[in-house]
Amino acid sequence: GGLEPFEQRLIEGMRKNGYDEQFARQIFQQILGFGEYGFPESHSASFAHLVYVSSWLKRYEPAAFTCALLNSQPMGFYSPSQLTQDLRRHEVPILPADAVVSEWECTLEDVRGEGGGEEQPALRLGLCLVKGLSQAGGERLVAARRAQTFADVGDLARRANLNAHDMQALAAAGALSSLSGHRRHALWDVAGVERMPALLDAAPIAEAQPLLAAPSEGENIVADYASLGLTLGRHPVALLRERLQRQRMFTAAELKALPHGRLARVTGLVTGRQRPGTASGVTFVTLEDETGMVNVIVWRDLAERQRKELLRSSLLTVYGTLEREGEVVHLIAGRLRDQTPLLGSLITRSRDFH
């Protein structure tokens, strides 16, 4: 903005150079329009406004902020797993995806007491996060449930007209727990519905549910990541913490208290790798454990020497030197170690070089 005082000067100059006045005024109007957004001040102001609004929402309405981000996926730098882990670290309750309660999108549920204060509503995960569940099937499920609550898994499959693929996706994600119990019972019930002849679709199932052992904590976490891309159980690194403590690994939270220049080692899930074109070959790696995030700087020479560990690790240990500038903490990597085998069959995803 602020270009109006230059209008007459520009028009007169263009006329002296052989352009007619109408064309000169048209050019000025185009420049005027560009001036509304095209100069550093305008860019800075608009970006600062977005940052301020986002920061305010994250600080004062974290449940609603995260809910909106989850419903906008896929987008941005942070995955659903990172978003939900951050929300849990801020002690906002998150409720699981549940065919008996969840909408297609994530929603908020008021679990606040009458005491007021800064309590947040709970975030209810939506069926949209269930991998393999079609949107059409999920929306039919929600519509059928609004008409009448589901009596059992067979009733759900029948009235929502879900195919075997959709039902298996719900069972694998633990979204049938309110009707069947744990995942193994849900998968058994779904298999029974699939085997039911069409003639007997509406007949009640009198067969007793078998006594199947519940999955272990680790098995549930593996299934969570496979079916939802996130877990509401313990963070995978938390299951390894006792072992990591014996290796004298710091947590992300503990790193923040260490002094500048301290040698440190940390292990976390790799959530992102970035190598900006302006960074002279430096790679930035983000690690996550049960206490937070760790920003790691890998210089070019180390990246070239340990390319395999840098690019292929899902669980990475970094030995390095802490660099602190005020509240900002980085770990300058000196050595990398691939710890992915400790995850077993757990498969995680990272956002790399976007």
What residue ranges belong to the model's regions?
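Noncatalytic, beta-rich nucleic-acid-contacting surfaces in large DNA/RNA-processing enzymes
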Residues: 1-354
